[in-house]
UniProtKB/Swiss-Prot annotation:
Binding-site positions, substrate: M648, R649, V650, I651, D652, H653, F721
Cofactor note: Binds 1 [4Fe-4S] cluster.
Catalysed reaction, written as an equation: 2 Fe(II)-[cytochrome] + nitrate + 2 H(+) = 2 Fe(III)-[cytochrome] + nitrite + H2O
The name this protein goes by in its record: Periplasmic nitrate reductase
Length: 755
């Protein structure tokens, strides 16, 4: 029997309601006696950045069941994808032995581990010797374990001497990092998921929480159900399922959200809803050029964003601007939540700053339920990459490449000679693949990510990956990943709970995934692979003197010690016993930190500090309200391409479907990509629901089935990117935010016609 998406979503909604009412999660159903696990092994869900705790049921050495961990923050709940992880783990579609392509255009064929590692080491070593260390690169992932990203970062920055270390968090979270750092001086949210249970107003902007973070959405919905007076404002050009529980849905014109938030600030100040007691003591003001200003300067700046003017720009009712501002400011505790709709923009950092501005001008921050909280898309983008410094401009624990003091600290911690870490940042993601296409980067390791599917302007990327001098190594579990078409060497990793390691989720919580089952075939833990590769490539053996992932974790704890990321107290033994700990956690008896920057709660704030709040990432302890200009997108619609095109998520799939595509229930529910079209736009072009249409941009054209509905606002079309047969990222431009270098997936110009 075929399953329609509508039926599937009905089933999901019904199941979610039952699960929420009963306290049970997906996957906690009764099991047949002959399939009952002999043991349950603790871990973390392999999908989004919510970081739900799971228990994997094992019998006869095989994973047979999964359920939510009742002791973790998700309280035993899992989303549908998480509840169906076991078929992914047990899939027969796995890379189980090393594969080599002996010449460009040839086929991948089996090779021994010894030959594979020797080939890999010799190619990297010879490239470094002939062309210098910047001819090699690592492209990692927010799906790698913390220990894997740490070892790779150490090998490349400390061993090879190149900062060409980047990864897919550049595509999703770099603007959030830039926003936190420029506003507060340090990355990562100050609150936790527990704030959801205390908030009385939710400002959700650029996030389809219901489909991208379903467990958190259920928690928000439950909060509204328990206390109906809680206000939910959803600002999104699409009328998503998230918006359907909102008290107010602001469907602004794409790219005008910065003006909308400035206008909210205008209302707050002009109606005296701001909190002078807070901002006078804890905030500095900076103008558009980054020069010091003051409250009066900010107030004058906002005169350009009066609600009546901005309502016309955004094409929303002016009452929504006033209503959203009042609800935000007058609430006892307001929590903002955002994701890719804010981050994946050429104004992504500025947009993040403006959310923080609203919290700072109202004092809606650093209290239970009052926080600005960026949602994360991958299970370890925060812990392994952001905290671990595995991007081209970063070093571990909040250190930065351009900072000489930080470089010296890491050289000492890693036992390196002075000056070993290069002072210039390496290539960010888009520039890295451009360098590959020019032949400047010769050798690259791509680990647990699928850039030949996910990067923008893919035709350009595919050409770069086909460079005749390139040598691309993929550490990849699934053979249908598009990137393997461009790989010269493929190494099979142990996947998820086939090895042990730590994931760090969006609320600063680090949780241990324990090994539950053995990997198939010749698959190996990636930590072991990287250590052996480094030794064969001539890296000092003492630099990678790790026997296992626990050795790596203990070194990483030491590197964090004494920093504002301090998690020295998170021993492996504690992580085995507890269901996650939230940093800072500087000692083994420390419970973890729910509220950062608060005296008496954050161990990084001195106990005798005279102020209640101390934003210690800034020299004077004050956060910053920025007067960021509300600029447009890199590519706006015009007469030739009159529509906005944006990317979107579907609840059934995650990223490039290399995992969800292995689950029949998920694949049947949404087997192919499509384009969402508003009813007005469809009527104007003669397109009906189900018609085959051509979506075209300045980069490429693609044939897709049309879904005609009221989800997109008029003038906007949307496509999901999960389908490997429809690589829709060929359509998007690769313009990047000038601060974060995150690409603009959310806005470009397009046109559509019947095929």
């Amino acid at each position: 029997m075929s399953t329609s998406r509508r039926d599937f979503l009905k089933y999901f909604a019904m199941s979610a309601a039952v699960a929420a009412a009963s306290g049970a999660g997906f996957g906690s159903l009764a099991l047949a006696a002959d399939n009952r696990p002999e043991k349950w092994v603790k871990g973390v869900c392999r999908y989004c950045g919510t970081g739900c705790g799971v228990l994997v049921g094992v019998k006869d050495g095989k994973a047979v069941a999964i359920q939510g961990d009742p002791n973790n923050h998700n309280a035993g709940l899992l989303c549908l994808k998480g509840s169906l992880l076991i078929p992914v783990l047990n899939s027969k579609e796995r890379v189980t032995q090393p594969l080599v392509r002996r010449h460009k255009g040839g086929k991948l064929e089996p090779v021994s581990w010894d030959e594979a590692l020797d080939l890999m080491a010799s190619r990297f070593r010879s490239s470094i010797d002939m062309y210098g260390p910047n001819s090699v690169a690592w492209y990692g992932s927010g799906q790698c374990l913390t220990e894997e990203s740490y070892v790779a970062n150490k090998i490349f920055k400390g061993g090879f001497g190149t900062n060409n270390v980047d990864g897919n968090p550049r595509l999703c979270m770099a603007s959030a990092v830039g926003g936190y750092v420029t506003s507060f001086g340090k990355d990562e949210p100050m609150g936790t998921y527990a704030d959801i249970d205390q908030a009385t107003c939710f400002f959700i902007i650029g996030s389809n929480t219901s489909e991208a973070h379903p467990v958190l959405f259920r928690r928000i919905a439950r909060r509204k159900q328990v206390e109906p007076g809680v206000k939910i404002i959803v600002a999104d050009p699409r009328r998503t399922n998230t918006s359907r529980i909102a008290d107010m849905h602001v469907a602004f014109r794409p790219g005008t959200d910065l003006a909308f938030m400035h206008s909210m600030a205008w209302v707050i100040i002009n109606e005296e809803l701001d909190n002078p007691r807070f901002w006078q003591r804890y905030v500095n003001f900076m103008d558009a050029e980054g020069k010091p200003s003051d409250f009066e300067g900010y107030k004058a700046f906002l005169e350009n964003y009066r609600p009546e003017k901005v309502a016309e720009i955004c094409r929303v009712p002016v009452e929504q601007i006033y209503g959203a501002a009042r609800a935000f400011a007058e609430s006892a505790a307001t929590m903002s939540l955002w994701c890719m709709g804010i981050n994946q923009r050429v104004q992504g950092v500025f947009a993040n700053n403006l959310i923080h501005n609203l919290h700072l001008i109202t004092g809606q921050i650093c209290r239970p339920g009052a926080t600005s909280f960026s949602l994360t898309g991958q299970p370890n983008a925060c812990g392994g990459v952001r905290d671990g410094g595995a991007l081209s401009h970063l070093l571990p624990a909040g250190r930065a490449i351009p900072n000489a003091k930080h470089r010296a600290e890491m050289e000492k911690l890693w036992g390196l000679p002075e000056g070993r870490i290069a002072p210039e940042p390496g290539y960010h993601t888009v520039a890295l693949f451009e360098a590959l296409g020019r032949g400047d980067v010769k050798c690259m390791i791509i680990c647990e990510t699928n850039p030949a599917h996910t990067l923008p302007n893919l035709n350009k990327v595919h050409k770069a990956m086909s460079h005749p001098e390139s040598f691309i190594v993929c550490i990849e579990a699934f053979p249908d990943a598009v990137t393997l078409e461009y790989a010269d060497l493929v190494l099979p990793p142990a996947f998820w709970c086939e090895r042990d390691g730590v994931y760090g989720c969006g609320e600063r919580r680090y949780s241990l995934t324990e090994k539950a089952v053995d990997p198939p075939g010749q698959c190996r833990p990636t930590v072991n692979t990287l250590v052996e590769f480094a030794r064969r490539a001539g890296v000092d053996p003492q630099l990678v003197n790790f026997r296992n992932a626990e050795d790596v974790w203990n070194e990483w704890r030491m590197v964090s010690k004494g920093t504002t990321y301090d998690f020295w107290g998170m021993t492996r033994e504690r992580l085995r016993k507890e269901s996650g700990l939230i940093w800072p956690c500087p000692s083994e008896d420390h419970p973890g930190t729910s509220l950062r920057y608060v005296r008496g709660q954050d161990p990084c704030v001195p106990a005798d500090h005279p102020d209640r709040f101390f934003f210690y990432g800034k020299p004077d302890g004050r956060a910053v309200i920025w007067m960021r200009p509300a600029k447009g997108a890199a590519e706006e619609p015009d007469a030739e391409y009159p529509l906005y095109l944006t990317s979107m998520r579907v609840i059934d799939h995650w990223h490039t479907a290399t995992m969800t595509g292995k689950v029949p229930e998920l694949q049947k529910a949404n087997p192919i990509a499509f384009v969402e079209i508003n009813e007005e736009d469809a009527a104007r072009t003669g397109i009906k629901h189900g018609d085959s249409v051509i979506v075209e941009t300045r980069r490429d054209a693609m044939e897709l089935p049309a879904r005609v509905s009221d989800v997109c606002r008029p003038g906007l079309i949307a496509v999901p990117f999960f389908d490997p047969k429809k690589l829709v990222n060929k359509l998007f431009l690769d313009a990047t935010d000038p601060v974060s270098r995150e690409p603009e997936y959310k806005i470009c110009a397009a046109r559509v016609r019947k095929a």
